[in-house]
Amino acid sequence: MKFPQTGLSHLVSKSLIQIRGPDALRFLNGLLTTRLLPTITKKKQHTISSSDNSAIHATLQDVVDVSTNYGLMHEDIYDPEHNILIGRDGLNSMILNSKGRVVTDLYLYAMPFSTYLPESETCTDNDSLWGKTLESEMSQPNFLMEVDSSRVKSVILMLKMYKLASKVKILPRDDLKSYYYYNDSAEFDDFLDKLQGEYFTSTVPRAALDSANRFIKENAVFQSKKFATGFVGFGVDYRIPNFGIKFVSNKQITASGTEAGSGDQVTIENVFSDTFKQQFQVQMVPEDAIIDRRFSNGLFETGDVAADESSLLPFECNLDYINGLSLDKGCYVGQELTIRTYNNGIIRKRIYPVQFFKLTDNAKEQIKQEREKEPVLESIFLENVIPTTPSSSKLTLSPLQDVPGDLQNKAQEQTNEQTQKSSSPFETSSKPVRKRKSSSGKVMSSRGDWGLALLTISDVTKSPYFKVDMPSSSSSSSSSSSSSSSSSFYNDGGNKVEVGVKAIVPEWWPIEE
């Protein structure tokens, strides 16, 4: 999978929802997996982690006024010092249902990011209007929630259902646009480390706002005079360390060489500061590049699957790995199963990045000898052998049972279709019972020769190689087959093809002890 090394993209697949009002903090804190309030509510032992951070909680209560637009709380469950920072930059989170299943992932912005207005000899009506807007938006808790556009209506409906008597306003913001910039270079990684150390290490709200204003004024990333007006939200994407930067604006950014047609448009040259452009290339790229890059790094989003096909648990979506979970916030919808699972340490499945390849006899032989030599596998685009990609629930993954093993014994592949005698403590029965076919997981989504698959962790530990199965009713091989599934597909030439899968453990995953 190829994509540009750097680029800026308008995330057209994302929609924004504004949640503001006196009760907005408490309202969202009861829904999100991340923490927004300085206080905790410990009703049962398993509602928060067993660590004692009472001193930190007491300090937060002294500095955070929940009736104000203080910003957001940032914490990392893998931080041994349990630091909690206050910032105007955004954070990653999820909303669960009452059974602890994922409703949607989201990115939450404090709105507005800053109150800085660039100094100008000629103050325009637009500048004056923006100044009044900032004053109004800072008067009470105010947030922007970014969700996948395919789920925005259901999320708004759910928010309004939970609202009850809370004093909050829930508004779709179709006038605002989400943007994403990335640069896969060591220099940019170092730049983001310095950026966060310089502007996003505050522990009190006043200092957080001052740092955000200084971030804009000093042109750390963006041009303050040409782009500050209309700059709404900002955050470093730390789902993967220093993965990119996200920001929200009311302006449409256009490519180089194009003319801005109105005051609501700005060219990419006028977005980033001169200092930033001297260090890093800036160019517009399609959103497909952002998605391809995310897939190749194994970063799953709930928008990758249809809402009616998903009943995922947060740990299956690697929520604990992508900085989207607080262990000390107390009660929220779906928290009991989540925290109990974390405390028990029993997580059976996770979503892995996978690569598809042609499962030929030669590939099987190479996999068998993997310890001696790295297999050279021929990649395959899943959509080339499945003209219309079926729903994820139809594409299951099973272990390569003949690897390692006797490759010449092809009959061994049919063991799951054989019958066995049923046993009873009361009588002997000759009634045949079909042996249940083992499944290690399923393909959640695919793009070219890459995909994201939900797999049993223990199976991946044994071997990262699997084969793709599809129910015979959806397979083009035969609709009258007695088997429950088929591992054969057909390419454009009508030839039968078997598809293999190699699961990859991302380098950015924490090392499990």
Swiss-Prot record:
Record's subcellular location: Mitochondrion matrix
Positions of region (Disordered): 391-445, 465-494
Swiss-Prot/TrEMBL GO biological process terms: iron-sulfur cluster assembly
Bias type Polar residues, positions: 409-428
GO molecular function (one): transferase activity
Predominant subcellular localization, coarse grouping: mitochondrion
Keyword Lyase in record: no
Gene Ontology cellular component annotations, sorted alphabetically: mitochondrial matrix
Targeting presequence: 1-44
Biased composition (Low complexity): 391-400, 472-488
Keywords, sorted A to Z: Mitochondrion, Transit peptide
Domain of life: Eukaryota
Family affiliation: Belongs to the GcvT family. CAF17/IBA57 subfamily.
Entry-linked PANTHER family: TRANSFERASE CAF17, MITOCHONDRIAL-RELATED
Protein name in the entry: Iron-sulfur cluster assembly factor IBA57 homolog, mitochondrial
Species name: Lodderomyces elongisporus (strain ATCC 11503 / CBS 2605 / JCM 1781 / NBRC 1676 / NRRL YB-4239)
Species classification: Eukaryota, Fungi, Dikarya, Ascomycota, Saccharomycotina
